[in-house]
Amino acid sequence: MTASLVGRTSTAVFALGLAFAGNSIATSLSGPRLGLIFDRSGGSLRPISGIPGAATTGQALDLGFKISGAEISPAQDAALVVNARNSSVALIRASGGDWVAASLDGVQPGPDMMAYSPGGSAAALYYAAGRVQILTGLAGAPSIAGELDVSTLPSPVTAMAVNDAGSFVLMAAGQAGAVSLYRVAAGSAPGLVASFRSVSSVRLFNAGQQALVTDTLAATVYQVTDSAGVAAIQVIASEGDGIQGLIAADTDAAGQRVFAAVGSGTVFIFDRSGGPPAAIACACAPTGLFRLAGGATFSLTELAAGPLEVLDANSAPRMVAVPPPVQAAPLPGGHR
């Protein structure tokens, strides 16, 4: 796999012609930033500069092509993107003051699902044909660490997580009402971990020893411990805690607090050591919990006509808004 400075060269695999080496991009990387966000309607990535309460959404990064999908690293310094034209996969990452594109030789086009590891060093790409490609070294020299056969899993696959070493993947699969969580590693058949009514997300934490499983049908958030052996299942939050209409759940970077967003616009915050949950209202209809930079910063909404609604729980929890981007087409060379 080769890396090139986008904007100064173009890779043969993606013919990117990216324009990120200009001063405007270097400037955008020089100050504090909350990370990247996928602009689904615009088919692009946009940077969010600043800090919670004083942040702005920047202009679309000029990739040279539209993207149909993106998985952003938890470190907010890289993203795997899918080219909308030919379904090829590219790695876009920050390096110094520039954005760099790495050509991912051997990576199959058209993944149906992508997932970064908690630390951003590895990723898993799932294909509906029944295979998973594991990428490692994403912070340095990316490589394909292996490929897993998951053709025996029921369909559809609803969620996936991979550990930082890329040594195993957790996959949720099955029809609504009967979804099972499996542990998949090279050289062994998928092993059943537990079964749920539904699984909309799986998040690994505590060095991959524990997983947070979100079951929206049951309005329950579970903690699964030691998925490599006999799994211990613990309920972190349930309907009785007020999370009816559960949309999404995630942990802070330390894995100590669990955040659960519900459709009414409330985010409940649970401490895994116990005690009653805290609650904070969002003047929005949450569509998910999209991690941003910082130990406990999440966007509750995606880019649309209005501002991004962001939960900042790095100290006293609060909701802040990030204004929508000013519409302007990116120009080659990073100049506008």
Label each PLM-derived region with a short phrase.
Residues 1-12:
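Bacterial N-terminal signal peptides that target proteins for export
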Residues 10-21:
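Bacterial N-terminal signal peptides
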Residues 26-54:
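An edge-strand/N-cap motif at the start of beta-rich repeat modules
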Residues 33-39, 77-83, 121-126, 167-172, ...:
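Short beta-strand elements that form the blades of beta-propeller/WD-repeat-like
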Residues 42-47, 86-92, 130-136, 176-182, ...:
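Structural motif
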Residues 50-53, 93-97, 137-140, 184-188, ...:
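Short loop/turn segments that connect beta-strands within beta-propeller blades
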Residues 55-65, 99-106, 143-151, 188-194, ...:
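A short beta-strand motif characteristic of beta-propeller blades
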Residues 65-75, 106-120, 152-162, 197-208, ...:
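Repeated scaffold domains used in trafficking and secretory/extracellular systems
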